[in-house]
Swiss-Prot record:
Gene3D superfamilies: 1.10.287.90, Cupredoxins - blue copper proteins
EC assignment: 7.1.1.9
Natural source organism: Branchiostoma floridae (Florida lancelet)
The entry's keywords: Copper, Electron transport, Magnesium, Membrane, Metal-binding, Mitochondrion, Mitochondrion inner membrane, Respiratory chain, Translocase, Transmembrane, Transmembrane helix, Transport
The gene coding this protein: COII
Mitochondrial matrix side: 49-62
BP GO annotations: ATP synthesis coupled electron transport
Subunit-structure text: Component of the cytochrome c oxidase (complex IV, CIV), a multisubunit enzyme composed of a catalytic core of 3 subunits and several supernumerary subunits. The complex exists as a monomer or a dimer and forms supercomplexes (SCs) in the inner mitochondrial membrane with ubiquinol-cytochrome c oxidoreductase (cytochrome b-c1 complex, complex III, CIII).
Membrane-crossing residue ranges in chain numbering: 27-48, 63-82
Predominant location category: mitochondrion
Protein name, as recorded: Cytochrome c oxidase subunit 2
Family affiliation: Belongs to the cytochrome c oxidase subunit 2 family.
Membrane topology qualifier: Multi-pass membrane protein
GO cellular component, one term: mitochondrial inner membrane
Length: 230
């Protein structure tokens, strides 16, 4: 999860987020090189004692500053397109869950193998335990098995919401009357926090999302426990 005064990205907890971090570093390298080149050119021009006042055109330089930016755009665009299609790639998911946004809480359904449904509300400050995150803890967490291909169906019951978990590289709008989907695979055990990322009313800030990634055996035990409570 994010920490105070954090400047970098969260640690990746999914293959997609790892690729996003690599792409971020790739683009930042390109931007730094461009910035250094521009500042160097400015410094040379400012410090130069020679001025050619009668230069009206230059076919070579115009070709250079057209071709080089085009090449740079291709260098940035190709990894971006690859990542874009990777985020939408969903091949034979092993588990499907449905997330429904409400004002102002989330409800979840596990309908593939287990008939499990529950609502997930933010815990008030008075119910927090020592070490819990303020405004991020919920009464019912989404429990998922690690290293498992999961399909998340996202929709809303009232207004537009957005189901977002940064450390997993997930963000999908929840639109009433429309069913969106995204691919999810947790690459390590842990607890990952997110929030609604679409302004949806007075209590928009109080719609946290908590995903708990556990080993498959623990997930099966959790499912049995939830079924016993039904």
């Amino acid at each position: 999860m994010a920490t105070p005064a954090q400047l970098g990205l969260m640690d990746a907890a999914s293959p997609v987020m790892e690729e996003m971090i690599y792409f971020h570093d790739h683009v930042m390298l390109v931007l730094i090189l461009i910035t250094c080149l521009i500042f160097y050119s400015m410094l040379v021009l400012i410090s130069s004692k020679y001025i050619y006042r009668f230069l009206t055109d230059g076919h070579v330089i115009e070709t250079v500053w057209t071709v080089i930016p085009a090449i740079i755009l291709v260098v940035v665009a190709l990894p971006s397109l690859k990542l874009l299609y990777l985020t939408d790639e969903l091949d034979n998911p092993q588990l499907t869950i449905k997330s429904v946004g409400h004002q102002w809480y989330w409800s979840y359904e596990y309908t593939d193998y287990y008939d499990i449904e529950f609502d997930s509300y933010m815990l008030p400050l008075g119910d927090l335990s020592k070490g819990d995150a303020r405004l991020l803890e919920v009464d019912n967490r989404v429990v998922l098995p690690v290293d498992t291909s999961v399909r998340v169906l996202v929709t809303a019951a009232d207004v537009i919401h957005s189901w977002t978990v940064p450390s997993l590289g997930l963000k999908m709008d929840a639109v009433p009357g429309r069913l969106n989907q995204l691919a999810l695979q947790c690459s390590r055990v842990g607890t990952f926090y997110g929030q609604c990322s679409e302004i949806c009313g007075a209590n928009h800030s109080f719609m946290p999302i908590v995903i708990e990634a556990v080993p498959v055996e623990v997930f099966e035990g959790w499912c049995d426990m939830m079924l016993d409570e039904e």
